[in-house]
Amino acid sequence: MSIKVLNNNDKEVNVLHFQGKNVDILWRTFALVKNYCELNPIEDYLSLVSCWTDNNNCYLYQQLKNNNIELINALPYNYDYTQKWNMINKIKFYIDCLENRVNTKYVMLLDGYDVLFTSTKDILKKFKKTGYRIIFNTSYNNYPEEDIDYIENREEKLGFFHYFNAGCCIGYREDLIRFYKECLDFVYIYNPLQSEQKILRHCFAKYSNDKKQKFIWLDYKREIFHTMALTTCSYDANTRILKINNNYEGDKIKRQNKKKI
């Protein structure tokens, strides 16, 4: 019997992002989700896309393969696996992959090494309900720690998870192509960590404080995506429900440490 994963509002969530070292910190939760979340077939006209170089370490690929669900690798067939990884190329790979998926209307772009599905139920229903063309994951972590995308009254408006996270998104295929092409306009930005997160955030900033735009926004209610940084989890073996809670104590410690600096 499959387990069910709920956010702190008791709503079923679809995708967990164990960003950074959270695969190691929340390894029990990770193992529960990877081994005991049974997934139904993906809805028609929705494609799942990622980039990965090692099938053995791509947990998302392994999970979806075990559930007979296709995960498309955006890396080209002639990709040189010996070359140094370049996040700018990752953006270009996504664009090329999406342009070739002409029969796909919706696409979900996902990190391969620290993302798992908990459910495939009602993904498109939740997405369409937002009214936006693209929805990105959110995180408590402001990474990189710069004022890039301004949102008025960010924390009051969006809650605990209020920063853009590039690890997961869903959108209409043609709009994702448009957005990722716009991201290439920001590749000149100084980016010592070679992170596409910084580039994508600069592009997101073009839209983030425009209250009238309905092009791109954040899944701050965590109805589709849920970042696992600063969370705690509790599992009830009787109901087979895994509950995710915001770690406000961790939040307080983080704020106190910032004040000391």
Feature locations, PLM:
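Conserved beta-strand elements of beta-rich interaction domains across eukaryotes
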Residues: K21-V23, T53, N78-Y79, D114-V115, ...
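Short His-Asn-centered micro-motif
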Residues: Q19, S50-W52, L110-G112, S119, ...
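A conserved donor-nucleotide-binding helix/loop in the catalytic core
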Residues: Y81-L110, L116-D122, F161-F164, S195-I199
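Conserved donor-nucleotide/metal-binding helix-loop-beta segment in metal-dependent transferases, i.e.
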Residues: V115-E155
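A generic structural motif
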Residues: L71-Y81, F136-Y140, P192-Q197, W217-I224
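Catalytic core and acceptor-binding pocket of nucleotide-sugar-dependent glycosyltransferases
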Residues: M1-W27, F161-I261
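Short, high-confidence coil segments that cap the C-terminus of an alpha-helix
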Residues: K11-V13, V102-T104, G131-R133, T239
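N-terminal anchoring/stem segment of glycosyltransferases
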Residues: Q19-Y106, K129, E174
